[in-house]
């Protein structure tokens, strides 16, 4: 089961926008050393929309190589085309990928029946465990709990990253899925509350800059020490907030550069560099949280 602090890992690039392979190794080692429980490779934070198909596959495979069995690797494999999602998922059938994270189709705005058939078709094309990913603010469609319940009956659909920030979803989902179905928060600010209600962990943007804190926070939740978990979360709230002052991953890549975790905060168009105003606010949040 995937639990605890799972980092939604950034994809490091050099000054010209090429993938920084050794920079990726440094990040993987950093997360191994700081208690992260698993890595999501090439999800939203990893700029899945900005990489070519071959780059996407390369980054996931390099992440597996550098992890070397020390951390599970979850591959981002979603697409708004069902056939493309199947193609990308099947690239990892013979790899050491632990699971795939499949985002709801963006732009198309499918019906709930369309979403059901989309994810069923992907799951039936592979033996790899599938984690659903619901993030309506980015995709324009909402995978409702009733549809998740239907999908949870498919053997290799094993969980969901629920990123609405709507805590009512936890109880709704728990009533509709089996007890082994994995519930992961995709919203750092509300993650402690999500887990307190029965969630199993968080796929975290903040873990890029505060992996030890996020890991410790999750450990406290697992021990039912919610006071200690909230103490950490309250210190990190300005960081959680600041990492979304601009579209993800613009702020978190800048923050990682400031922390010396990557050499450049290079992004690919249409993403552009962070504004001076926001960089000042992010720096203050990092300093106030004793991260910088």
Curated annotation (Swiss-Prot):
Provide the Gene Ontology terms for cellular component. cytosol
Catalytic site positions: 133 (proton donor/acceptor), 161 (schiff-base intermediate with substrate)
Q: What is its main location?
A: cytoplasm
Q: Where is this site: Part of a proton relay during catalysis?
A: 44, 107
List residues binding pyruvate.
45, 203
Q: Which PANTHER family match?
A: 4-HYDROXY-2-OXOGLUTARATE ALDOLASE, MITOCHONDRIAL, DIHYDRODIPICOLINATE SYNTHASE
Name the chain's protein: 4-hydroxy-tetrahydrodipicolinate synthase
Q: Which organism is it from?
A: Blochmanniella floridana
């Amino acid at each position: 089961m995937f639990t605890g602090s799972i980092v939604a890992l950034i994809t490091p690039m050099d000054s010209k926008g090429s993938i920084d392979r050794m920079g990726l190794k440094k990040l993987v080692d950093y997360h191994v050393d700081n208690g992260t429980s698993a890595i999501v490779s090439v999800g939203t934070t990893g700029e899945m929309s900005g990489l070519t198909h071959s780059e996407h596959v390369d980054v996931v495979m390099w992440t597996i190589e550098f992890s070397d069995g020390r951390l599970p690797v979850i591959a981002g494999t979603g697409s708004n085309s069902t056939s493309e999602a199947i193609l990308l998922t099947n690239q990892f059938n013979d790899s050491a990928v632990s699971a795939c994270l499949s985002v709801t189709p963006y732009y198309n705005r499918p019906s709930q029946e369309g979403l059901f058939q989309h994810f069923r078709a992907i799951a039936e094309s592979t033996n790899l465990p599938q984690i659903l990913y619901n993030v309506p603010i980015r995709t324009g469609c909402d995978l409702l709990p009733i549809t998740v319940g239907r999908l949870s009956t498919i053997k290799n659909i094993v969980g969901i990253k629920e990123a609405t920030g709507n805590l009512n979803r936890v109880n709704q989902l728990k009533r509709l899925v089996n007890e082994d179905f994995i519930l992961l928060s995709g919203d750092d600010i509300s993650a402690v509350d999500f887990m307190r209600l029965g969630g199993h962990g968080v796929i975290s943007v903040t873990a890029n800059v505060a992996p030890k804190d996020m890991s410790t926070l999750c450990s406290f939740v697992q021990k039912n020490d919610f006071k200690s978990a909230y103490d950490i979360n309250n210190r990190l709230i300005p960081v959680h907030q600041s990492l979304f002052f601009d579209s993800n991953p613009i702020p978190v890549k800048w923050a990682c550069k400031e922390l010396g975790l990557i050499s450049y905060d290079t992004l690919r168009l249409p993403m552009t560099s962070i504004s001076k105003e926001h960089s000042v606010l992010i720096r203050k949040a990092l300093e106030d949280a004793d991260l910088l």
